[in-house]
Design a protein with these regions (language model features):
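Cationic, low-complexity basic patches in intrinsically disordered or flexible, solvent-exposed regions
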Residues: 24
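Beta-propeller blade termini and top-face loops
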Residues: 32-768
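Intrinsically disordered, polybasic Lys/Arg-rich low-complexity tracts
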Residues: 4-19
């Protein structure tokens, strides 16, 4: 991001001041003013749920489309082997800068969390838990989430989909890479890992390339009678009807994961396997759920160790309606089973098909959901169920929120409320992906969700978040307050816009709720901030006051934007630009907005740059790869002057030289081409300055330090790199940085540090 990204605006009338959102804040006793920095910033509104599921239903899909445009379009998902290969190549080919000897360090948040996909616990010591993060690797806690440590830092892939622990040998843990949550930001993996020492070290046991196992592993099941008998389930392409050899489905190993065989009784082509459960007391009995968008979807059972399978249909809806389905079997009475199923036939494939109960080992089923789940949605994304270890009628399940029955489904009650304040005992983060109730502590409930780990010690009545120390936040962008050395933050996936006003990694708080968006600080006043979330909604913060200053665009225009880019005029922080498929500008700090451009190329605006050297020059790029400019501060606009030199994919970031407004740099998303380009004439002509030196991965961030205009910093899926413009040589700044995608770069002048926001491992700092 340009260094002027730290420029920001103010607010006018006071609206509402919300109480603290529960994270630790070092303030002067309730005024919102931080003692160390002197900055006052009170939280704005959390994203509230409207009646019915419609508000939240589209979020993960809208996010997916936005994410895909910046990472993989026109293909469905990132070629993960290309990422690994390119990262390895540049580590060897590009040297580190000789003048930088310090190491990257994580600067938070460590108290916010991020998307977790799975959780397991030690069978004899339920306080010892391991979780997998969608973009942050595997983490271990010895004390039920009070403290955390990661031993996954140096692995080539941080995208985790499933964990399983061998009950007979608890030091043996399996990890399936590649998230299987059916959104386009569910990044693929490279195969199945194994640890023989309780998660301290890991080895790649079975690679997807060698064995053909799925690139998105969502479940690992270990036979309780034979630890060498493993089953895994996963997804391949995002649509099961697609062809190719990157198949999902169920895979079987009888030699502890060395070799694998794909089951084809559902389909020889692509299908999904969501849940696999071994009968706890009956040898060779296995249950599993599948989706193939046809008559063979649903719940299946084998009674001979997997040689033959029977489709269980009695009392269940038409098989073709079964989408993602989670399965649970009672440990105290294995005849009782529950299934929590997504309706593949619903309009957006996100609604609940039903909660189904069997009292006879799966022979017959009954829908016990009633009308309770009418407002529950997004079941293809968050989908999990668990049965109490000692009470087969005590069941917890859910997606966005969690729901409880204590009488086998006769009645239900909602037990978590994501739209409450974070310090409310009924609050747990939204989008639940895995539930665990340890046999040794049957009333303890662990929930792995988009906010990290929530824990109940009383069977779900009250909840606390146990994510402190779990630095797995998935950022979209970040900014720093240039007037303070202690204030910075960013917009995060499903964790709002979060900031710290003390410089402490453990004192972040939620400034704005929901999915975080763009954040921009006023360069002269750290207490003045703009922040956005989806659908062009923009809020302005002035210390203790906040105000909705969303541009007056038609609803159809707002709905076309997942995350609105915001930037300030470097010469006047009261002049702010944002965009949908056209450019909006305010000259009075957000009080009034005007659409200053026509529709550009029909796609969403991806970046806006107001040149510090001449603020009349405004450059705009789009998701379709378009490039437009205004020479009069936004009054008039050029046609699309994107050059054939540019690849035609999303231009993710624009940056101009602090000394020359005509010198423009651009980064481009996706794979298969160069990614960094320079124009010396304001975008009329372009040249490739990547020249194959940089990794062929999506690029997201650009930065020129005002103190060092001869260097250009870029952030991409493989790390951080710097160009010496005089020599044309690139250098690698990635040493000691986790293998997570770097989505934003900002230089913090007062702290003399480069900050990198990652999608999965929080924010990191490199001191100069």
């Amino acid at each position: 991001m340009p260094t002027q990204k730290g420029k920001k605006a103010a607010a006018t009338k006071k609206t509402v001041r919300r109480k603290s959102s529960g994270q630790q804040r070092e303030t002067d006793g309730g005024t919102g003013k931080n003692v160390a920095s002197g900055v006052t910033l009170a939280p704005g509104p959390r994203k509230k749920r409207a009646k019915g599921p419609s508000v939240r239903l589209s979020n993960h899909k809208a996010r997916s489309v936005w994410f895909q445009a910046r990472t993989t379009w026109p293909v469905r998902e990132a070629p993960v082997r290309t990422l690994v290969r390119e990262r390895t190549r540049v580590q060897k080919a590009l040297a580190a800068p000789a003048n930088i000897t310090s190491n990257w360090e994580c600067v938070g948040p460590t108290n916010i969390g991020g998307r977790l996909t799975c959780i397991v616990c030690h069978p004899q010591h339920p306080e010892r838990i391991w979780v997998g993060a969608a973009g942050g690797g595997v983490w271990q806690s010895p004390d039920s989430g009070q403290t955390w440590q990661s031993f996954w830092h140096d692995q080539e892939i941080l995208n985790i989909g499933a964990l399983a622990i061998d009950a007979k040998k608890p030091d043996t843990i399996y990890c399936g890479t590649g998230e299987a949550n059916l959104s386009l930001d569910s990044y693929p993996g490279v195969g199945l890992y194994q640890s023989a020492d309780g998660g301290h070290t890991w080895q790649l046991l079975a690679s997807t390339d060698r064995t053909g196992i799925p690139r998105h592993i969502g479940v690992i099941a270990i036979d309780p009678f034979d630890s060498k008998h493993l089953l895994i389930g996963g997804v391949g392409y995002s649509e099961v009807s697609q062809t190719g050899n990157d198949y999902g489905g169920m895979f079987v190993s009888v030699d502890a994961g060395v070799t694998w065989r794909r089951e084809t009784f559902i389909s020889a082509k692509n299908y999904w396997c969501h849940s696999i459960v071994f009968h706890p007391t009956k040898k060779n009995t296995i249950f599993a759920t599948f989706t193939e968008q046809g008559a063979r979807s649903g719940i299946w059972r084998s009674t001979d160790g997997g040689k033959n399978w029977t489709h269980l249909t009695s009392g269940l809806p038409d098989a073709a309606r079964f989408g993602r389905t989670s399965l649970a079997i009672s440990r105290s009475n294995p005849q009782v089973m529950f299934a929590f199923a997504n309706d593949e036939a619903s309009g957006n494939k996100d609604l609940l098909l039903g909660v189904f109960r069997s009292a006879n080992g799966g022979n017959t089923w009954k829908d016990v959901s009633g009308t309770h789940f009418a407002d529950e949605g997004q079941i293809s994304y968050g989908n999990t169920i668990v049965i109490h270890p000692t009470n087969p009628d005590h069941v917890i399940c859910g997606g966005v929120d969690l729901h409880l029955t204590k009488n086998g489904g006769k009645t239900w009650v909602q037990i978590t409320h994501w739209d409450l304040e974070r310090d409310d005992p009924k609050y747990a983060h939204a989008d639940h992906h895995a539930l665990l109730m340890p046999a040794a502590v049957p009333d303890r409930v662990y929930s792995a969700n988009d906010g990290g780990l929530d824990v109940s010690e009383n069977a779900g009545r009250t909840w606390t978040n146990r994510s402190n120390g779990l630095s797995v936040t998935m950022f979209y962008d970040m900014d720093v307050a240039q007037s303070s050395g202690l204030v910075y933050g960013g917009g995060a996936q499903d964790n709002g816009t979060v900031i710290t006003t003390s410089g402490s990694s453990s004192s972040f708080f939620e400034l704005l709720g929901g999915d975080g968006g763009w954040i921009v600080f006023n360069p002269l006043d750290a207490g003045r901030v703009y922040a956005s979330y989806y659908n062009l909604h923009i809020y302005r913060f002035r210390g203790d006051e906040f105000k909705n200053v969303t541009p007056p665009a038609p609803a159809s225009e707002k709905n076309s934007v997942w995350m609105a880019y915001i930037t300030l005029d470097p010469s006047d922080p009261n002049t702010v630009f944002t965009g949908s498929f056209r450019v909006w500008r305010t000259r009075n700090d957000g009080n009034n907005w005007v659409a200053v451009s026509p529709t550009l190329d029909g796609s969403s605006i991806s970046a806006i740059e107001v040149a510090p050297a001449d603020t009349k020059r405004v450059y705009v790029s789009t998701e379709n790869g378009g490039f437009f400019r205004s020479l009069d501060g936004g009054g008039t606009w050029s046609p699309n002057i994107s050059s054939s030199i540019l690849p035609g994919h999303t231009i993710t970031r624009l940056e101009t030289s602090p000394k020359d407004a005509r010198l423009v740099f651009a980064t481009v998303a996706n794979f298969g081409h160069s990614h960094v380009f320079r124009s010396a004439d304001g975008g009329t002509t372009w040249e490739d300055i990547d020249r194959g030196q940089l990794p062929d991965v999506p690029h997201h961030a650009l930065l020129i330090r005002e103190e060092e205009t001869g260097k250009l910093y870029v952030g991409n899926d493989a790390g951080v790199f710097v160009l010496d413009m005089a020599s044309g040589m690139w250098m690698n700044l990635t040493k000691n940085l986790p293998n997570a995608m770097v989505v934003d770069l900002v230089y913090h002048t007062k702290d003399a540090a480069l900050l990198a926001a990652t999608y999965g491992r929080s924010i990191w700092r490199l001191k100069f």
